[in-house]
Amino acid sequence: MDHDNEYHDNMVTMLELIWGKGYMAPGGAGNVAKLLEGTSPRGRHILDIGCGIGGPAFEMARTHGAEVTGVDLEAPLIARATSDARELGLHGQCRFETVDIGPLPFADGSFDIIVTSGALTQTNDKASLLEECMRALKPGGYLSSYEWMRSGREYSDDMHYWFKMEGLTYALEQLGDYEAKFMHAGFENVSATDASDWYRAEARREYALIKGELYESMVRLLGQKDADHFVEDWRAMVVVIESGEMRQGYCRGQKP
């Protein structure tokens, strides 16, 4: 499984136009608030796994008063996040580093909270990552995750077509599978919340945006061919979201 540089610069810029500056996943500040709900983040040390270009980390620092360490597999994303942290005057609260697939490079009990938006979606060996999160958390700490998921039925032709259009590494599972894996890793007070209805409406809005007012910007950034591919990719995603085959959800657990 090779995740190296799946997101090139212009693609990142397009995602920011759709999802907001610094964000490579939907929901913006609202998604960050949902991830941190009930965790008392002020003054806490948070690990953001799959931090991308740092938008969620900056929000956690500015609005929620946390100290944040962000990690990602892709060095260009980390370089951008580090540069933006300096520019925003948040380099004292936010630091970023590139990591490889495998054990997290942190001592046991390093973090009060661990968050992720999509890291488990793109990880085949979810059990190992959950075990690492458990190890890196302090007792009483939380792991809070927002992920793209699947329904229980076999993938349709529409789903296979969307995977082809995406060209990214996905390892989708059902919401109940996440809940079971969190519990198997030793987490307590596990909760799993379906967010599919929320993102169904968001995806429709995003599709209208990229085939409408953002289209000319996409052509300038990506060229005609890639812009049209981007629009078709989003159309294909809306199809599998509308059918209920591609789903979204939150899962949270607490270390004993």
Report residues per predicted region:
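A short acidic, Gly/Pro-enriched loop at the edge of an enzyme's catalytic core
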Residues: 102-113
